[in-house]
């Protein structure tokens, strides 16, 4: 399926940091199961993500956003097509990609400090160097006073800060984020969105961020890729034509929000109609 030509930005895309990785997705398809029970989650998705770009994958539940993200992470191989990062095929997880989940995925028996430094210890980073990295990252994310706490003692927002800090400590060129703020209240979500933008502006990593929130996608992303309902195909690929910082109350922001809402609702309605009639969504 051919994607609509991207909209033009009103601001240049900032330069990527040294080592930021391009991601090339070519004809990505994913089928779960076989025979009559087979489910086509993704179908022929093609996209090129330049290093340092912040991309949001947007669409209704079940459109294959997380499936595509898991394929980029190397967690789940494609049925057909390919994904390459910095020119190398993605076949399994690697240190060049860090994943942040909605469920935090922290080790409950470890302190905040131990969680942040876990990957550094696995890599065999010298203790003094690891101490310095943990202190620096914790300071940037407001965690310095919580290093001795355990995850159970933290709010959801603080736990997600720890999850992000653990990834930043390893300094991968790509950050993959699967609805990381979806379980948070509105105020905490906005605070962490701003924190993420600040971190991205400083480190300029390639970020692929899954969300079903249209407002979140517009607020965060350089670029938004809208996927169709199952099977997930590219419905629209657009650059966000708004300068940062973005005002969610502006006419331009809300015009784009209405446009994207129309696209997403169209896919939701197609699926609902297919469910009612028993026909295919194709």
Which positions does each model-derived feature cover?
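Short coil-to-helix segment of the ABC ATPase nucleotide-binding domain corresponding to the Q-loop/switch region
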Residues: 110-118
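Helix-to-loop junction immediately C-terminal to a conserved catalytic motif
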Residues: 73
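A short, proline-enriched helix->beta-strand linker immediately N-terminal to the Walker B motif
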Residues: 169-173
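Conserved ABC transporter NBD signature motif
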Residues: 81-93
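Conserved ABC ATPase signature
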Residues: 150-154, 158
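Conserved ABC ATPase "signature" region
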Residues: 117, 121, 128-146, 198
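The feature captures the beta-strand-to-loop junction immediately N-terminal to the Walker
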Residues: 58-60
């Amino acid at each position: 399926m051919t994607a609509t030509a991207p909209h033009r930005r009103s601001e240049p895309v900032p330069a990527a940091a040294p080592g930021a990785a391009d991601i090339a997705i070519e004809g990505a398809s994913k089928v779960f199961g076989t025979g009559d029970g087979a489910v086509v989650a993704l179908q022929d998705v093609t996209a090129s993500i330049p290093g340092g770009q912040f991309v949001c994958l947007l669409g209704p539940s079940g459109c294959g956003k997380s499936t595509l993200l898991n394929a980029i992470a190397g967690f789940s191989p494609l049925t057909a097509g390919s994904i390459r990062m910095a020119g190398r095929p993605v076949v399994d997880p690697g240190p060049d990609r860090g994943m942040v989940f909605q469920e935090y995925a922290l080790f409950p028996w470890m302190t905040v400090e131990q969680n942040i430094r876990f990957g550094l210890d696995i890599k065999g980073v010298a203790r003094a160097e690891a101490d310095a990295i943990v202190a620096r990252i914790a300071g940037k994310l407001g965690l310095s006073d919580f290093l001795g706490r355990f995850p159970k003692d933290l709010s959801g927002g603080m736990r997600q800060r720890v999850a992000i800090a653990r990834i930043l400590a390893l300094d991968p060129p790509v950050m993959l984020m699967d609805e990381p703020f979806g379980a948070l209240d509105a105020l905490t979500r906005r605070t962490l969105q701003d924190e993420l933008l600040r971190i991205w502006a400083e480190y300029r990593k390639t970020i692929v961020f899954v969300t079903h929130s249209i407002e979140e996608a517009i607020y965060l992303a350089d670029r938004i890729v809208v996927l169709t309902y199952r099977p997930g195909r590219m419905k629209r690929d657009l650059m966000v034509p708004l300068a940062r910082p973005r005002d969610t109350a502006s006419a331009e922001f809300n015009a784009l929000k209405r446009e994207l809402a129309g696209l997403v609702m169209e896919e939701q309605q197609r699926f609902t109609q297919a469910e009612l009639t028993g026909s295919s969504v194709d």
